[in-house]
Amino acid sequence: MTKQLNVDPAEISKFEDMASRWWDLEGEFKPLHQINPLRLNYVTDHAGGLFGKKILDVGCGGGILAESMAIEGADVTGLDMGKEPLTVARLHALETGAKLDYVLRTAEEQAELHPETYDIVTCMEMLEHVPNPASVIAACAKMVKPNGHVFFSTLNRNAKSYLFAIVGAEQLLKLVPKGTHDHKKFIRPSELIAMIDQTPLQDRHITGLHYNPLTDNYWLGKSVEVNYIVHTVKL
């Protein structure tokens, strides 16, 4: 019997169609470029630096975070199930000279091949795009070394996140294309922590990601009502 992959074909197709514009700083992925320094600094600070670390970026897309970690001196592998985003990621790395690998594979498949391999695993803005986020979390836990770090980021599911992420970001401000997100797939922090608790990971820190449309500015803060990041360590 063929094992069913933890992949939503509609989600893959959506990002395949936008792949050529992944590194357009004023295009659909502008918000990812804007928040990337925040994500990079958060991972760097909480993991005790990146230089020389072996890192897996799950759901890497066109490689924005993966490439920035490689530039910091990490040994990075980017993992995704979108062929076009990975092609764009590889081409951009050639242009910049960044040294990293990209692999077309699910997190679950990678975990079977490379258990307890990575010092750091990042899984950013990905869990809300797969049918079974708990399976991805378990795979990330399997792939990280003992005492290694795993980072997850996603969107909370409540009225405010619908207003900000769907109505605001997609419909009014057009920060991202309509249909980028499905509010029903957003994950409450309590739900994410419950899934983490089913693995050897222990949650250590949580922070929110905030946006001011008047100043077009992002920052990290205490409130986790919309976007948030969780730092975990493998026991």
Curated annotation (Swiss-Prot):
> Binding residues for S-adenosyl-L-methionine, per the UniProt record?
39, 59, 80, 124
**Cysteine pairings via disulfide bonds:** none
Q: Which residues cross the membrane?
A: none
Give the domain of life.
Bacteria
* GO BP, one annotated term: methylation
Q: Show the GO MF annotations.
A: 2-polyprenyl-6-hydroxyphenol methylase activity; 3-demethylubiquinol 3-O-methyltransferase activity; polyprenyldihydroxybenzoate methyltransferase activity
Which InterPro entries does this chain map to?
Answer: SAM-dependent_MTases_sf, UbiG_MeTrfase
Q: Which CDD domains match?
A: AdoMet_MTases (cd02440)
Q: In which pathway does it act?
A: Cofactor biosynthesis; ubiquinone biosynthesis
The keyword S-adenosyl-L-methionine is assigned to this record? yes
Q: Which UniProt keywords apply?
A: Methyltransferase, S-adenosyl-L-methionine, Transferase, Ubiquinone biosynthesis
- What's its EC? 2.1.1.222, 2.1.1.64
Specify the enzyme's EC class, one word. transferase
Query: Pfam families under this entry?
Result: Methyltransf_23 (PF13489)
What is catalysed by this protein?
a 3-demethylubiquinol + S-adenosyl-L-methionine = a ubiquinol + S-adenosyl-L-homocysteine + H(+); a 3-(all-trans-polyprenyl)benzene-1,2-diol + S-adenosyl-L-methionine = a 2-methoxy-6-(all-trans-polyprenyl)phenol + S-adenosyl-L-homocysteine + H(+)
In the record, the note on similarity to other proteins reads: Belongs to the methyltransferase superfamily. UbiG/COQ3 family.
Q: What HAMAP family would the database entry show?
A: UbiG
Concerning PANTHER family, the annotation shows:
METHYLTRANSFERASE, UBIQUINONE BIOSYNTHESIS O-METHYLTRANSFERASE, MITOCHONDRIAL
Q: So what does this one do? A: O-methyltransferase that catalyzes the 2 O-methylation steps in the ubiquinone biosynthetic pathway.
Q: What is this protein called?
A: Ubiquinone biosynthesis O-methyltransferase
